[in-house]
């Protein structure tokens, strides 16, 4: 939520990511509870590949979680120009800035950019793929949890 204050153009993106993380985990825990599973990290073979990889390989899951947090911390630290002035070890090998244009929508940023010359920007570039996998796992978790809840509830409603 701190990032939504520091980057007002990204307010809805920041809030949506928090809602996705909390909502997908809550639904996963609730769905697993209804299935009498011992943990929300128990996944079936029929689950999405990304969820199986995420929950069966704890090192991979840890790397994704740490990568996501590092990216958020880097975005927070990037608001300080003194930190952004620290050159990274690959400053000459990378382009000065990498930008990805995004579709325009109110409350959402229109460009994702990273200053690659700074050490912080290079750290963010390393963390970005892990963050992306964690978000993909959250979406997959949300979908599978909703499907499981419907599968659990549908027979009861059909009988009623």
Task: Show where each model-derived region lies.
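Multi-pass membrane catalytic core of lipid/isoprenoid biosynthesis enzymes
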Residues: 1-33
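C-terminal membrane-associated helical module and adjoining short loops/tails
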Residues: 32-160
